[in-house]
C-alpha cells in the first residue's frame, strides 16, 4: 500500500432549496392566500476520523466532494426536504487546514471525532412569509442560499508517542523491529525506509506505546531534501525522541549535528522535544572507540545517553526503562498542570 500523508481537496456544501410562489386553490375559495413553502437546507460536509484508514491515498484520486442540494418548497406551505450531510472518512491523526488562509480548522485524533468543514445553505422563504396587511397576495419568494465551498489541505500526522530519528541507515528500522512486532524493510543502504513505520512496544504491565520510525532525514530535510520534509511533520505529535547515531559512520558527531540542525530549522518546538541519545551498532565498535565516543557526546550534549546494539540487544532493556521513566514523568507533569488549571 502506498503511504500518502498529505492531500488537497475541494468540498462544496449543498445549496438551500428555493422557496416558491403558490396560492391556495380550494373549492369555494377562488382567491386564496399565499401558500408557497420554504426550501430545504442543503447538506453540510463533515469529516469523521476512522481507524479503518491509514493513509490519505483515496484523496489522490477523488478530490471534489459535493453534498446534495435541499429541495425546493411545495404548495400548501410544505417545506422542501433537507439534504443529507456528506460524511467523508479520514484517518485518525488528520489535521485539516484551509488551503487559502492556512488556518487550522481542526485536528482529528480519535476515532469518531467529527469536523464540519462546509455548512449547507439555508432554504429560501416561500411567498407565504411575505403576507402583510398591505400585500395580501405576495408574488415573490427567496432562492436558497449557496452552501459553503472551500479548498482543504489534509495532513496526516502519525499518532506515536516515541519517535526514532537519525540519518538514513542509522538503524531505526532494525531497532523498531526488535522492540516491537513491526516488520519494516531493512537493508544496508540509505533510504531503505521510504514510509514511516509504526510499532507497538509493550511494558511488562501489557500497556502498549506506539513508536514511529521517521525516515529520510538528511541535511536540508526541512527544505524538502531527501524524504524528510514530508515526514518531519510526523514528529510533531511525539512526546519523546530517540536520536540514533551510527557509531560505524565516518563522523558520528557531524551526523548528530545534522539532525539537530534540521529539527531546529523545521521549528514547531521539535528541537525542544525531550530526547534520548542512543549510540547504535556498538557490536561493531572496539571498546576503546566506544569509550572515546561516549566521552565526546557527553561533553557535547546534556541529554541522557545510552549505548545500544539492535543486533545483539545490548542496552535495549536500559533504553526501554529510560523511555518508560520519561513518559511517566511527562504524564505526571501533564496531570499536575491540569490540576493547577482546574484549581
Curated annotation (Swiss-Prot):
Cofactor: Mg(2+)
Residue ranges of every copy of the Obg domain listed in the record: 1-159
PROSITE patterns per the UniProt record, alphabetical: G_OBG, GTP1_OBG, OBG
Listed Pfam families: GTP1_OBG, MMR_HSR1
Binding site for GTP: 166-173, 191-195, 213-216, 280-283, 309-311
InterPro entries documented for this protein: G_OBG, GTP-bd, GTP-bd_Obg/CgtA, GTP1-OBG_CS, GTP1_OBG_dom, GTP1_OBG_dom_sf, OBG_GTPase, P-loop_NTPase
Residues in OBG-type G domain copies: 160-328
Keywords: Cytoplasm, GTP-binding, Hydrolase, Magnesium, Metal-binding, Nucleotide-binding
Alphabetized NCBIfam families for the sequence: Obg_CgtA, PRK12297.1, PRK12299.1
Name assigned to this protein: GTPase Obg
Organism from which the protein derives: Synechococcus elongatus (strain ATCC 33912 / PCC 7942 / FACHB-805) (Anacystis nidulans R2)
Designated gene of the protein: obg
Amino acid at each position: 500500500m502506498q503511504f500518502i500523508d498529505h492531500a488537497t481537496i475541494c468540498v462544496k456544501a449543498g445549496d438551500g432549496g428555493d422557496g416558491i410562489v403558490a396560492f391556495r386553490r380550494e373549492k369555494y375559495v377562488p382567491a386564496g392566500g399565499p401558500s408557497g413553502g420554504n426550501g430545504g437546507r442543503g447538506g453540510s460536509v463533515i469529516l469523521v476520523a476512522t481507524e479503518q484508514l491509514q493513509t490519505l491515498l483515496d484523496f489522490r484520486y477523488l478530490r471534489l466532494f459535493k453534498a446534495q442540494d435541499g429541495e425546493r418548497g411545495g404548495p400548501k406551505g410544505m417545506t422542501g426536504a433537507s439534504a443529507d450531510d456528506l460524511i467523508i472518512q479520514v484517518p485518525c491523526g488528520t489535521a485539516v487546514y484551509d488551503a487559502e488562509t492556512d488556518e487550522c480548522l481542526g485536528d482529528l485524533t480519535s476515532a469518531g471525532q467529527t469536523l464540519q468543514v462546509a455548512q449547507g445553505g439555508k432554504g429560501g422563504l416561500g411567498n407565504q412569509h411575505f403576507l402583510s396587511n398591505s400585500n395580501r397576495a405576495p408574488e415573490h419568494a427567496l432562492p436558497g442560499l449557496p452552501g459553503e465551498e472551500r479548498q482543504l489541505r489534509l495532513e496526516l500526522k502519525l499518532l506515536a508517542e516515541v519517535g526514532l530519528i537519525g540519518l538514513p541507515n542509522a538503524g531505526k528500522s532494525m531497532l523498531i523491529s526488535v522492540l516491537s512486532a513491526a516488520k519494516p524493510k531493512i537493508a544496508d543502504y540509505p533510504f531503505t525506509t521510504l514510509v514511516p513505520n509504526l510499532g507497538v512496544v509493550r511494558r511488562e504491565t501489557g500497556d502498549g506505546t506506539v513508536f514511529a520510525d521517521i525516515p529520510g532525514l538528511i541535511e536540508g530535510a526541512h527544505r524538502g531534501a531527501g524524504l524528510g520534509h514530508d515526514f518531519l511533520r510526523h514528529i510533531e505529535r511525539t512526546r519523546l525522541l530517540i536520536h540514533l547515531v551510527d557509531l560505524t559512520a565516518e563522523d558520528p558527531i557531524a551526523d548528530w549535528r545534522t539532525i539537530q540542525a534540521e529539527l531546529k530549522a523545521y521549528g514547531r518546538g521539535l528541537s525542544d522535544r525531550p530526547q534520548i541519545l542512543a549510540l547504535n551498532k556498538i557490536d561493531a565498535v572496539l571498546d576503546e572507540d566506544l569509550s572515546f565516543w561516549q566521552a565526546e557526546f557527553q561533553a557535547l550534549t546534556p541529554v541522557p545517553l545510552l549505548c545500544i546494539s539492535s543486533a545483539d540487544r545490548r542496552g535495549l532493556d536500559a533504553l526501554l526503562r529510560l523511555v518508560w521513566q520519561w513518559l511517566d514523568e511527562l504524564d505526571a507533569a501533564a496531570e499536575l498542570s491540569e490540576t493547577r488549571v482546574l484549581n
